[in-house]
A protein has these predicted regions:
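Non-catalytic N-terminal regions of enzymes
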Residues: 1-141
Length: 141
């Protein structure tokens, strides 16, 4: 088996209707470099708590996208070229992957760049978002 194998892609939409509007990015955001910031978090499950499934996380994400509806939108530009988020409720990108590696084998405290790339969804890896303008990418392994 590969170190990490992607087994599914989904767009997780908000659990209930959200406002349909456009939000300008702040002036600070306009001067920042335009790219997604990868972040990886590892959690060892507590013995008394059941390990969440991908379905559990998708349900939680859909509920969170209601008050934080901009994350279900898409980056775009206004007619005059200003960057903004169009709140479309299209959803957040969710990739599900499996691995036979333990956290220790993966190198949790000192992961290699190669291993990190296996877990972070990259632009172009989302087949349902051809324009690569999603505001939020998730990967569950």
């Amino acid at each position: 088996m590969e170190k990490v194998k992607v087994v599914g892609f989904t767009m997780v939409k908000p659990a209930s209707p959200t406002p349909s509007n456009t939000i300008w990015l702040s002036n600070l955001d306009l001067f920042a470099t335009w790219y997604h910031v990868p972040a990886i978090y590892f959690f060892r499950p507590a013995a008394s708590i059941a390990t969440p499934s991908a379905a559990d996380l998708k349900l939680s994400l859909s509920r969170v996208l209601v008050p934080y509806y901009a994350f279900a939108g898409r980056f775009t530009s206004s007619p005059d070229g200003r960057r903004e988020i169009k709140c479309t409720a299209e959803g957040a990108y969710f990739a599900e992957a499996v691995s036979e590696l333990s956290l220790d084998e993966f190198g949790v405290y000192t992961p290699s760049v190669e291993n990190c790339r296996l877990l972070v969804p990259a632009h172009g890896s989302n087949p349902s978002d051809k324009n690569e303008k999603s505001t939020l990418f998730f990967s569950f392994s």
